[in-house]
Each structure stands twice: as structure tokens, then as C-alpha cells.
């Protein structure tokens, strides 16, 4: 990547080129890289911003939230230096659907603190639902727990524009089919990772306690 970036940045037509990155926010860009980005017409960053705090660390192990937070803020600050276009492109699963309101609130607050513009309700916000591994899909939740998720999300969906639409879309997808036959597979998957990583799924998702009872 760096060799290609260096070569492109030296082209006479660099000002007509744009770049698109997807990042999981584990590595901060170096100044030399930033200086090269400034030569391009614009740079797009699709941030895999899957949650905050305990939710982030559950999904992005062994990444730590505080480091990811600083990197995200740094990317927001790049909007003050050159034309960079930043999008929230999270993948929504059983592990993080409950954290959508909190992560959206963090995004708005920190965008307004660190970016060159005020948050726009119609800017690039594009969460997508997880399809693989299938046992992590929100469609696996039993109806009782889907109702709990929907109750929290509907209550806290005080957003406007694309964020509001995104939460509603995730609720609709969650209810779109019943994959609860995969619940034992989800139980095995989460317990295996919790034991291996010394984590606890329920710290990030207390509303789902009891979901595996009887399995």
C-alpha cells in the first residue's frame, strides 16, 4: 500500500485521483502518509465503527477502546487539513445492535468536537447487517429478546436522518426471519471466545442475560 501510495502521489495527475479506505481503526495514520493524502483530489474513509467501550472491546479484541477512540478523533481532525470524506460503516450483529444509540451519540458529539464541519444528519452513515458467521446475525435472537432489543432501540432512537433510518432498518431486519434454531451455535461460539479471551458477552449486552438458559 505505502509503495503504491508513494508512486501515485508523485504522478502529475494525482490531483484528479481519489482514494477509498476501509479501516478498523486499530492503526493511526503517520504524518508522511497524511502528507501524501493531501495531494489527492479527496480521500474517503469508511470506518468500521462497530460500537464503543465494552462493545468495541468485545468485537475488536484485542484492540482497546481508548486507542480506537483517539484514532477515530484523529481521522475526524483530518477534515481540517484536506478534503476527506468520512463514513460510519459498522456491521450490526447480536454483539453490538444494543449499542447503536450510544455509538451514534458518541459519533455526533465527537464529530462536532473534532471535525471541520458540524454533524449533518444526512452525511455518510451506512451500517449494514452481519450475514457471516450466521450465528451472530440478529435474526438468531428469540422473539422475547428481539422485543427487548427493539424496545431499547425505539426508546433511544432520538436521532434524525440516516441514523434514525439505520436503527429502524436494523430492527426491521432483526424481525425479518426466525433463525433461533442457530441459538445453540451462538451459545457455543460466544462461550468459546469468552473463555479464550477472558471476556464476558453480557457485560456489553446485559439485556440479553438468560438467552441461553435451558440450552
Task: For the regions a language model picked out, list residue spans one by one.
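PAPS-dependent sulfotransferase catalytic core
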Residues: 132-154
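A broadly tuned preference for mixed-charge, low-complexity surface segments
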Residues: 40-48, 100, 149-159
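Radical SAM enzyme core and accessory elements
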Residues: 155-215
Amino acid at each position: 500500500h505505502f509503495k503504491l501510495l508513494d508512486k501515485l502521489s508523485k504522478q502529475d495527475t494525482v490531483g484528479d485521483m481519489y482514494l477509498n479506505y476501509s479501516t478498523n481503526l486499530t492503526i493511526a495514520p503517520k504524518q508522511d502518509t497524511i502528507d501524501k493524502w493531501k495531494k489527492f483530489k479527496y480521500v474517503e474513509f469508511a470506518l468500521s465503527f462497530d460500537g464503543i467501550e465494552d462493545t468495541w472491546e468485545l468485537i475488536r479484541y484485542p484492540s482497546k477502546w481508548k486507542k480506537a477512540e483517539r484514532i477515530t478523533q484523529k481521522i475526524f481532525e483530518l477534515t481540517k487539513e484536506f478534503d476527506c470524506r468520512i463514513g460510519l460503516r459498522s456491521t450490526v450483529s447480536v454483539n453490538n445492535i444494543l449499542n447503536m444509540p450510544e455509538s451514534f451519540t458518541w459519533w455526533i458529539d465527537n464529530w462536532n468536537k473534532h471535525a471541520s464541519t458540524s454533524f449533518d444528519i444526512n452525511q455518510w452513515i451506512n451500517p449494514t447487517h452481519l450475514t457471516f458467521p450466521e450465528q451472530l446475525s440478529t435474526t438468531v435472537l428469540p422473539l422475547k429478546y428481539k422485543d427487548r432489543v427493539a424496545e431499547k432501540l425505539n426508546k433511544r432512537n432520538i436521532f434524525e436522518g440516516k441514523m434514525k433510518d439505520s436503527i429502524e432498518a436494523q430492527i426491521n431486519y432483526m424481525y425479518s426471519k426466525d433463525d433461533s434454531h442457530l441459538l445453540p451455535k451462538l451459545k457455543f461460539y460466544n462461550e468459546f471466545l469468552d473463555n479464550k479471551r477472558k471476556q464476558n458477552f453480557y457485560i456489553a449486552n446485559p439485556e440479553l442475560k438468560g438467552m441461553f438458559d435451558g440450552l
